Amino acid sequence: MGHGLSCSRDTDEYDLFRAAQLGDIHALSALLAADPALARRATVYDRFTALHIAAANGRLQVLSMLLDRDGDVDVLSRKKQTPLMVAAMRGNTECVVRLLRGGANVLTFDSPRARTCLHHAAYYGHAECLQAILGAAAQAQGPVAASWGFARFVNVRDERGATPLHLAARHARASCVRLLLDKGAIVSAPTAVYGFPGSTALHLAARAGSMECIRELLAWGADRLQRDSAGRIAYAVAMRRGHRACAALLNPAAAEPIVWPSPLKFIGELEADAKALLEAALMEANREREKRILHGSDINIKGGDEEEESEDEEEACNICFEQACSMEVKECGHQMCAACTLAICCHSKPNPKTLLLHPPACPFCRTTISRLVVATTNSNKTNSRRRSRSRSSSFKGGLSSAMGSFSRIGRGSGRLVVDGSSVGELADKPDHDFSSVAAAAAICDT
């Protein structure tokens, strides 16, 4: 008789887990109505509950029903993994959001490597899940703010000293790298033993051969000269792995990339549309640098006469006279293109010890820039445009000399020894890019 009851219970458990896997809400409801205790049963080996199984398979209705029945949102499997971790691994964003809304703890660590749900989302490259978790962690009244603080959570380490940024870079998850950097991940933090002791995200991206991750990391100020515990820079790692294109970008002899000016307070306060314009200008400038490094020649990208004429109908930038004005200094109302605005913001480098950066000044009126917005278009600005051009004509001599001085940055040649052998073919320094708009920054020093 006892054997019969045991078989019946095992069958009910199997049916429950099967219904959770397939999303059969009606079968699940019937089973739980007959025996509510089934909701707490777990599989024999992995100790997955129906909640884990629903989260892993993206069964949102089943998940919601189980949570509404007072299911334990942070129930642990054999490896101490929560349903939130499982959903983040599988990229089931809707389930992640529902679990977070149900009070799932983002600070739970699993047992294999002491990783959080943030680690798992970054490792598997699920940027939407990552965004949802970071959004929940950023809540002012949430448990992260009360105990850890958001900045510490973004840079949380596993037992091998790897942060979510390290995992994303090692597995070439460029969208996750971008998101984590934007949320405050420390770009040059070293690992303890993960990958190779002392590796930064740049070392790990070089090991993976991910050009996209390397672009993102360099644009956020990753140090090409930082060494791991064996004394290797990221360039040496890329060369050893045979990723020659990555090595060309990482070569310390090559021109430095333009770095996102995150230390500036008003950069952190940019509205989404203004931030998107500046980010696009940054990536375009660094892609031009990349082309020069990889192809060894200047690439002149200009539109035809028709395109130039259509741009001229808009308010042209009075610094480069090439692009339409897209950014406006809020205090004084002067306008520039996104590329020139970025050149001004990136001209001065922050103090590496304090990361302090003095705010730049408007190149036209010398007002300290404290806020940037997207420029408002107005077709009837002929008079103001003429006045602005006449005002900027006094800068033309300085612009020419500044362009020359900026273009010489990074010029020359050099050789770097990697593992005892010199690599000369990749060590020639190309001209510094961004010279067409770098003159804008020189105005700030006059």
From Swiss-Prot:
The keyword Transferase applies. Keywords: ANK repeat, Metal-binding, Repeat, Transferase, Ubl conjugation pathway, Zinc, Zinc-finger. PANTHER family: ANKYRIN REPEAT CONTAINING, RING-TYPE DOMAIN-CONTAINING PROTEIN. It catalyses: S-ubiquitinyl-[E2 ubiquitin-conjugating enzyme]-L-cysteine + [acceptor protein]-L-lysine = [E2 ubiquitin-conjugating enzyme]-L-cysteine + N(6)-ubiquitinyl-[acceptor protein]-L-lysine. Its EC number is 2.3.2.27. A zinc finger (RING-type) spans 317-366. Pfam families: Ank, Ank_2, RING_XB3-XBAT31. GO terms for molecular function: transferase activity; zinc ion binding. GO terms for biological process: protein ubiquitination. It comes from the Eukaryota. PROSITE patterns: ANK_REP_REGION (PS50297), ANK_REPEAT (PS50088), ZF_RING_2 (PS50089). Residues 376-401 are annotated as: Disordered. It comes from Oryza sativa subsp. japonica. This is Probable E3 ubiquitin-protein ligase XBOS31. Pathway: Protein modification; protein ubiquitination. Gene3D superfamilies: Ankyrin repeat-containing domain (1.25.40.20), Zinc/RING finger domain, C3HC4 (zinc finger) (3.30.40.10). The gene is XBOS31. SUPFAM superfamilies: Ankyrin repeat, RING/U-box. ANK repeats lie at residues 46-75, 79-108, 113-142, 160-189, 197-227. Transmembrane segments: none annotated.
